[in-house]
């Protein structure tokens, strides 16, 4: 069965364009008379892949053998007759006006708002003002004859209707996730293109199921980065963590359990200085007993007359050898600290204090600064 004039038949293509919204309704041709039975149809609004900045409205059959039609949005007239009742008029030469009945008034309102805003976006892109609505109707879309066609090269990018708000952005983000998980490269590229056109900020993360199971025990060696006696001024703790947790979450956990702010924490795992946004698993943490190193920096004093609370925090942060005012779980492994024989050099990357004769950092392998003079450091 060939489609009626004015509408293009829709092929069952699994890599279909981006669908902004799809709703179900009972559709009946008005020219068929009152006795004609309404048929279940699916209406969908999609971004036109061949004309950036434009949309298409599809009327899809839900039963075997039903003809599915699709028109450019600017070529149709869409009228709201009531909370549940709408009318769809295709361009001249088409199948005639359809009566569209929604079961859910909220769904009908959401659909009408999306069509209205998408139509407005198309008008802004074409540069043609929208004609005034007829007194007896509430047209959402202007008559097709009033729409001026413009060259494809001057058409704007696809724009998301404003009234749909974050709901549509979240729906597109969900579609992107589903397309990637299903291996649908074309659909993922289309959705990603729409999101990129609107500079939508996304937080792309792996699901927890892709990480090693947890919780596990992370063996942490705590060092005072301000002390030259790193080998003698260490403490050891065991933290219960999940491999999917980020370094930032680990810093917050240490702050919650021991009182050390994230700003003074430097984590080194697998000879790498850890970045807050990366996961523990990305540094190879996957099982009980995996090692990690935590270096604590001295917090700078804001003013000379700081509060008593800040003074207490300074004493807690000045771990070794200035004071031993540590939480009970972070007591140094050696209670008597020997006097320093000579100062070492501080790694510019992870702040680890290395022995003066080491050419590179013991923790992260960063090369020793060329300007560091062991003789001058020893004299001070």
From Swiss-Prot:
The UniProt record lists the keyword Transferase: no
Region of interest: Self-association: 1-177
Species of the source: Mus musculus (Mouse)
Residue intervals of the Ubiquitin-like domain: 216-285
GO molecular function, a single term: zinc ion binding
Compartments it resides in: Cytoplasm, Cytosol; Synapse
Identification of the protein by name: Sharpin
Gene behind this protein: Sharpin
Gene Ontology biological process: apoptotic nuclear changes; defense response to bacterium; epidermis development; keratinization; mitochondrion organization; negative regulation of inflammatory response; positive regulation of canonical NF-kappaB signal transduction; protein linear polyubiquitination
């Amino acid at each position: 069965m060939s489609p009626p004039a004015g509408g293009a038949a829709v092929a069952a293509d699994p890599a279909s364009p981006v669908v902004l919204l799809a709703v179900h309704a009972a559709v009946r041709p008005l020219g068929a008379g009152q006795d004609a039975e309404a048929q279940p149809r699916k209406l969908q609004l999609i971004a036109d892949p061949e004309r950036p900045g434009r949309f298409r409205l599809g009327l899809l059959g839900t039963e075997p053998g039903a003809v599915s039609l699709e028109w450019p949005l600017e070529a149709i007239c869409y009228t709201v007759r009531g909370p549940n009742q709408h009318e769809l008029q295709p361009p001249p030469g088409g199948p005639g006006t359809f009566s569209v009945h929604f079961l859910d008034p909220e769904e009908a309102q959401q659909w009408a708002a999306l069509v209205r805003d998408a139509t407005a976006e198309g008008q802004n892109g074409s540069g043609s003002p929208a004609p005034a609505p007829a007194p007896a109707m509430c047209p959402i879309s202007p008559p097709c004859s009033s729409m001026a066609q413009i060259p494809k090269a001057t058409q704007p990018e696809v724009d998301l209707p404003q009234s749909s708000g974050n709901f549509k952005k979240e729906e597109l983000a969900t579609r992107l996730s589903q397309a990637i998980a299903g291996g649908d490269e074309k659909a993922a590229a289309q959705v990603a293109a729409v999101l990129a056109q609107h500079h939508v900020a996304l937080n792309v993360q792996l699901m927890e199921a892709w990480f090693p199971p947890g919780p596990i025990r992370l063996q942490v060696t705590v060092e005072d980065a301000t002390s030259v006696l790193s080998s003698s001024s260490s403490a050891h703790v065991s933290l219960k963590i999940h491999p999917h947790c980020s370094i930032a979450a680990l810093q917050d956990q240490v702050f919650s359990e021991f009182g050390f702010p994230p700003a003074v924490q430097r984590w080194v795992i697998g000879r790498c200085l850890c970045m807050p946004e990366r996961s523990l698993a990305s540094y190879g943490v996957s099982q009980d007993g995996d090692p990690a190193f935590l270096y604590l920096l001295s917090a700078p004093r804001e003013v000379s007359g700081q509060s008593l609370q800040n003074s207490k925090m300074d004493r807690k942060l000045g771990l070794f050898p200035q004071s031993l005012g540590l939480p009970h779980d972070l007591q140094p492994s050696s209670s008597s600290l020997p006097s320093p024989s000579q100062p070492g050099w501080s790694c510019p990357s992870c702040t680890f204090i290395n022995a003066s004769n080491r050419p590179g950092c013991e923790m992260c392998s960063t090369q020793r600064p060329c300007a560091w003079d062991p003789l001058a450091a020893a004299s001070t």
